[in-house]
Amino acid sequence: MENLGDKLSISQVYHLAQEYRDHAYSIANKIGSEEGLKQYYGLMNMSIQMFQLLKTKCTLSVLEDSKVTFEMVELLIQETYNFDLAELYISSLKERLQTHQSDTDLVEEIMRCEFLLLHDLPLMRDSKFHYKIALRNCNELVQYMVNLQDELYQNWASVFQYVGVMLCIKLKQHRRVKTSFHGLLSQCREKSQWKWFLNLCYVNYLLNERFPIPEDALQELRSTELHTVGPELYAWKLALEMVIQLCKDGNITDHLNEFKNFFDTNKQSLVTNEGKGCVIKIMPRIALKVELPMIFHYKELKNILLLLQSVSYIVNCYDEKGNFSRKFLPKVYSTTQKLIKNIAAGGVSMNELDSRIQTYKSILEFCEFYKVWEQTLLKGAVVTTESPKLGPSPGYVRLLQAMKVQFEGGGAVEEYTRLAQSGGTSSEVKMISLLNCYTVQAARVSRCSGDKQGELVEQCNKVWLQVEKLLQETDLQFNPIWECTVTILWLFSHFEPFSWNPLPCSDKQRAEYVSKLREFYSSNKFVAGEAVADNRFKLKKALLLQILVNYLGGRMLEHDLGEIYAISAKCFDMCRQQGGMRKVQYVIGIWHLMNCTVAMRGKDVALTNAKLEALVKQITSVKQ
C-alpha cells in the first residue's frame, strides 16, 4: 500500500478503522445512557470515515479495495442502516472487479458482492418491493452462470439458487419454495455438508410453516452425519428432530438421551465456536459462511431444550409424578433472566446484543404464556395475569381473552373467527380458535329451534370446513391429540343424546368418524387386557381426551353391560385426577348411575348418587 500523505500510512489508517470499530464493540454491553449511545455511534462513524478515507484518498489494489469495502459495508448495513450508500459502494466495487477480472481470479470477490446485493441487503430492508427486485436479479444471475457451462460457475449457481429460495420464503411463494428445494437437493452430492445444510433449511422451513414434511426429507435428516456437518449443524439437526417429535405428540426421551450424549462429546467445541459462524463447504474452491441463531450456543441450547420438555409435558401438569412443566417452566424463566443479566459483548455490536436480548425476552414471554395455559388446564378456566405480554405474538393473548369470555358464558365467536383468519397466527392458535368457535356454534344449534336453526347449521358447516382444511394442509394431521379432538367434537355435534339437534351429515362422513372413534377407543380403552390396535391412535397424555374417548366408545360402540359398567366406573373415577373437570365428571357420573341401575348394583347406585350430590354442591358453590 502507498503512504497517505506524510502522517499516516494506509495500513495505519486501516488498523485505526478497526480499532474504532472494535472499541465500540467492547463497550456495547456497558451502554446505559444517552451519552453511552453517542460514544458508541461516534466510534462507529469514525471507523466508517477511516474506511472512506482509504477508498477516496488512496490508491488501493483490487483486493485491498475489496477488503476495505466489505468491512465498511458491514458497518453501513448493520450499524447505520444506510442501505442506499452500502448498495452504492458494493455496486461500484463489483464494476471494478468485473473490469479487472481478466487479469486476476476475482470470482470469489464478485460473488460476495452479488451475495450482499441479492441476499444481505434485501433481508435487511425487509420489504416486498426489494425482495421482488432481488429475486428477479437473482434468477437472471443464476441463468447467466448456468449458460456459461463452467464448473466453477455451475457451483456458484447453486449458491444463488439457495439465495432465490430464501427470497421466495420471504415472499411466501410456498409452492415455488418446495419445488426449488427439491431441485437443489437433487443436484447435490450425496453425504455432503452442503446437501445436509440445505435439507436442514428445508425441514426448518416446513416446520416453521407447519407443512407436512416429506419422508425423503426426514430420511435425509436422520442420515445427517456429525463428522461431516460439524457440531453446530448437528445440534440444529437434533433440535429439528426434537421439535418434529413434539409436533406429533411423540415420546422425546430418546431424543433427550441423544442430546445428552452429544453434549458429552461436543460441549467444548460448541463453546469455543460460539459467534464464529459456520463454514459450509460447497466445493473445494467455494464455501459459504452462515451465522446460526444464538439459541444454538451451548447454554442457550440447553435452556431451549428444557423449554421444549416443559411444553411436551404440559398436558400432564395435573399428574403429581409427571408434572415436569410445573418444575421446568420456572427454571427456564429464571435461567433466561440470569442469561440476560450476565450477557457479555464478546466483540459483537450493540445491534447483535439487542437481538440476543429480544430472543431472551421471547423465551420469557413463552414461559409466561405456558404458565397461564398450564393453570387453565389445572383449573378449567383462564386465570388472570399481570404479565404485559404473553407469547411471541398478539394472537396468543387474544386467544386467552376469547377463551376467558367463553368460559364465563359469552360466545366469543367473533374473536375466534378473526383469530382464525389472521395472517400471522400460528396453526395451533388457528385450530383452537376454529374448534372453540365450532363448539359454541354447535351448542347454539343444540339449543335452537325454529327459523334460526338453518342459519346456525350453515355457520357450523362453514367453520368445520375450515377445520378440515387446516388439518389437511398442516402437520397437525400427524398429531393424535388434534385428530382425536376433531373426531370427538364432530361426534358430539352429530349424534344424540349429546346434542338435542344433531347436525346433518352424509353416511360417508358418519362412517368415517365412527371408524376413527373405534381406532382411538381400541388404542386407549381403560379396561385392562385390551390390545392396542394402532400406535398412531395412542394418546400418550391428555387425560380429558382419554376420558371422552372412553365415554363415547362406551356409549356408542360397546354392547356388553359388564364392559360398559366397568368403563363408566373408570371414567367417573379418572375425572378426579385433573382439576376443572367437575362438569365433565357430573355428565359421566349420570351415565355411570344409569349403568349401575341397569346392572342392578344397589350399593353402587347409592354411592354414585352421594358422589353426584357432593359434586353438585361443589359446582354450585363455585358459581356463587
Swiss-Prot record:
It is found in: Nucleus. Changing K331D: In scc4m7; eliminates centromeric localization of SCC2 in mitotic cells and reduces association of the cohesin subunit SCC1 with the centromere and pericentromere. Keywords: Cell cycle, Cell division, Chromosome partition, Mitosis, Nucleus. Changing K540A: In scc4m35; eliminates centromeric localization of SCC2 in mitotic cells and reduces association of the cohesin subunit SCC1 with the centromere and pericentromere. GO terms for biological process: cell division; double-strand break repair; establishment of mitotic sister chromatid cohesion; establishment of protein localization to chromatin; mitotic chromosome condensation; mitotic sister chromatid cohesion; rDNA chromatin condensation. GO terms for cellular component: chromatin; SMC loading complex. GO terms for molecular function: kinetochore binding; sequence-specific DNA binding. Interacts with SCC2 to form the cohesin loading complex. This is MAU2 chromatid cohesion factor homolog. It comes from Saccharomyces cerevisiae (strain ATCC 204508 / S288c). The gene is SCC4.
